[in-house]
Amino acid sequence: MEEWRMIKMKITVLVENSTSCRLYGEHGLSVYIEYDGKKYLLDTGASTLFAKNAKELGISLADIDTAFLSHAHYDHSGGFEAFFKENDKAEVYMQDTSAENCYFRTETGDKYIGIPVQLLEAYKERFHTLHTVCEVEKGV
């Protein structure tokens, strides 16, 4: 019979569309997660504001063990360069479609809204694409 154990999870929103008086908000999302003794980052928002909020909240980006990218749009991936400057160890997992070119069609032409190609190239050893739903660590 499988044994169950209770594990605490703490979720902190670092940046999203609304804000409190002491934190920055922006169009985008970044979430910090503590689970089973590990620290995770889900997305980095559109800019460096997630990092400023993390610092304000006493969260060290250098301590994050693993990062995830939900999808390639700039409002979820725009802060990865700032993240890599503070964290030299975390692997980043993303679905295989996240590395695709993403464009927004406007009246004046197409605008690229995906992950900067130069960032994917510069940190290619840390980006890992997943082709199916899987566990990257037990329970995650």
Protein language model annotation of sequence segments:
Residues 1-8:
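Short, Lys/Arg-enriched N-terminal segments with co-localized hydrophobic residues
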Residues 16-18, 44-47, 72, 97-98, ...:
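Active-site metal-binding loops of divalent metal-dependent hydrolases
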Residues 49-97:
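Active-site metal-binding motif and surrounding structural segment of the metallo-beta-lactamase
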